[in-house]
Amino acid sequence: KLLINEKTTYAEFAWHCNAIIASIGCSHTASSNMQNAYHELSIVPLEKTFPLTVRLINDQLFVVNPMNNADKVNVKDEILSINGVETSKLITSIYKHISAQANSETYKRQKFNTYFALMIPYALGFPTSFEVNCKGRVNTIKLKQSNEYARELYDPSENVCADNLCLEKVDANTAVITISSFNYYEWDSYPVFKAFVDSSMKVIHQSNIKNLIIDVRYNGGGSQ
């Protein structure tokens, strides 16, 4: 209650609510705020979003696309702090606002790596500008405002499946099943998923496949 007063903005209130909801530890319990990236991108001004594409890897935050700040930072630069807040402390703060089943850090990391352009501004109170300190750099770098929304790093080469469900024989002993979505329910398209699994298992059995790889990268779960 002490955090909320007559000067509290919508963004601040929503961020506080997220922390309360996230404390439940259930990925199916969330506010509309931050649950749907498309909704958030429609109401957050472009100039308020974080202007770099970044990725959190092993508790380190790296630039994977400098966007319109290519003259200031480079791909693979490690960001040590943003607006004076150490990266580790910033991530810890953001994690407290992400709903995840049993507070899974793996899920929270994936969520951050998807919605970083929104979560970083929320955590910092929507600053008018962003300044970063990068490893190996002496001076703080003031970033230019976003001229397009920074999106999650996606390498199309990692997913050669044209559809959501694919079976591929790599060699005589190995096969790969790609499942890009679990959006198959009994009242909708569950028969499609079941038929795919059944037919794939039949092919694998008939081909005497010994090694099966199940690829669920970029699978956001159900209701996607």
Predicted segments with their positions:
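Flexible, low-complexity junctional segments that flank or bridge functional domains
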Residues: K1-I213, Y218-G220
